[in-house]
């Protein structure tokens, strides 16, 4: 989390791979801009639902719809009301509900956008169909 400069220096030197995902993105707007300017996807975990994560929600708002993902980061970082318990994939729905509120869109629209991004990124998994 404190290695932004080093991470971006390495990616710049080696070339940012197509479809790079910043897993469990926890930076603020400045870090989001640096990643988005390099064509990366940002993936938000339950942290975005925490009361003290205003900067992270501001960073999420910078993310274009076609480069936005949500994730669990199981078994850690469960969103409220599950905070303090083991995180699980089912809780991604809560993270997506908060994401929809942040973006001012319906849960269905937010879920459709993030699902489409997942399908584009991970086409082999998408070919298996919904789980």
Regions found by a protein language model. Give the residues of each.
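Mid-to-C-terminal alpha-helical segments outside catalytic/metal-binding sites
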Residues: 91-131
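Divalent metal-coordination and catalytic microenvironments
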Residues: 23, 35, 73, 110, ...
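Short acidic/histidine-rich active-site segments
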Residues: 66-88
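Conserved short-loop catalytic and cofactor-binding motifs
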Residues: 44-47, 80-83, 98
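Residue-level signal for the nucleotide or nucleotide-sugar donor/cofactor binding architecture
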Residues: 2, 51, 87-90, 105
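Residue-level "edge-of-site" marker
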Residues: 48, 73, 113
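Short, active-site-adjacent cap segments at secondary-structure transitions
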Residues: 3-5, 77, 118
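Catalytic pocket-lining loop regions of alpha/beta-barrel enzymes
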Residues: 1-70, 126-131
């Amino acid at each position: 989390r404190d290695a932004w400069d080093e991470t971006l220096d390495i990616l710049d030197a080696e070339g940012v791979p197509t479809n790079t995902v910043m897993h469990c993105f926890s930076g603020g707007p400045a870090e989001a801009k640096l990643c988005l300017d390099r064509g990366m996807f940002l993936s938000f975990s339950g942290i975005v639902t925490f009361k003290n994560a205003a900067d992270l929600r501001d960073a999420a708002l910078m993310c274009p719809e076609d480069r936005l993902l949500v994730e669990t980061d199981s078994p850690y970082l469960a969103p409220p009301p599950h905070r303090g318990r083991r995180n699980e994939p089912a809780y991604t729905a809560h993270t997506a509900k908060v994401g929809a509120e942040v973006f001012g869109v319906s849960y269905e629209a937010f879920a459709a956008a993030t699902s489409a991004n997942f399908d584009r990124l991970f086409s082999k998994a998408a070919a298996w169909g919904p789980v």
